Amino acid sequence: MTSWLLNFPNINLNIAEPIDEFVRYININYGEVFVAAKKMLSIFINGINGALDMIPWWLMILLVVFATKKLMNSYRNGVIYGGLLFMIGACGYWHMMNETLAIVITAVIFSLLIGLPIGIALAAVRGADTIVRPILDAMQTMPTFVYMIPAVMLLGPGKVPAVLATVVYAVVPVIRLTSHGIRQVDQEVVEASRSFG
């Protein structure tokens, strides 16, 4: 008599079949679009990877050491980072590191290309922030692997789904910071710039 109060009811909600059918429908009807997009992104990623592979290992380490010195004003940190980079190569992972770096550079480029215009538009339209903020909050709280699942389902495994998942995750701070930065410009500066044309 009280079993329905203690045990969860047997509802048997099946969402796997509709999702499988939707993915199958997308792949059948729009598969060529995804294949073309995957090829274009692969060419872009491989181009960056090829450019990174052309940089000699010793030059890459020196660039990291001197960039760290310039940015952090510390040779000690530069030498540490250079040593760690050397260890990556010594362990035989130099090419894999370049592949990962190419994925990250590609994701950063696309995040900026997508996020900057959206952030500018959000700053220009009053009230849009109240609509978009919950969406951005939800996007930022999800782990990147959540975005990887649909990307792999539609594009297959590889570098391109990794780039797409990273872009979706990284575009949120770009949008937020662009919008916030534009809104925080002092009104007197805006008026002065308008008066000068």
Spans of features found by a protein language model:
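Cytoplasmic-side transmembrane-helix entry/capping segments in multi-pass membrane proteins
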Residues: R76-F86, I103-V104, V132-Q140, V167
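Transmembrane-helix boundary motif in ABC transporter permease subunits
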Residues: F66-K70, I88-H95, A107-L136
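Alpha-helical transmembrane segments and their helix-entry boundary regions
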Residues: N77-I80, M96, G119, T130, ...
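N-terminal, non-cleaved signal-anchor transmembrane helix
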Residues: M1-A102, I109
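Juxtamembrane membrane-interface segments at transmembrane alpha-helix termini
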Residues: G89-L101, I114-L116, I175-R183
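Membrane-cytosol interface at the C-terminal ends of specific transmembrane alpha-helices
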Residues: A123-G127, R133-P134, A138, M142, ...
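Loop-to-helix entry region at the N-terminal start of transmembrane alpha-helices
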Residues: H95-S111, D137, T144-V174
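Alpha-helical transmembrane segments of multipass membrane proteins
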Residues: V65-A67, L85-F86, L116-A121, M148-P150, ...
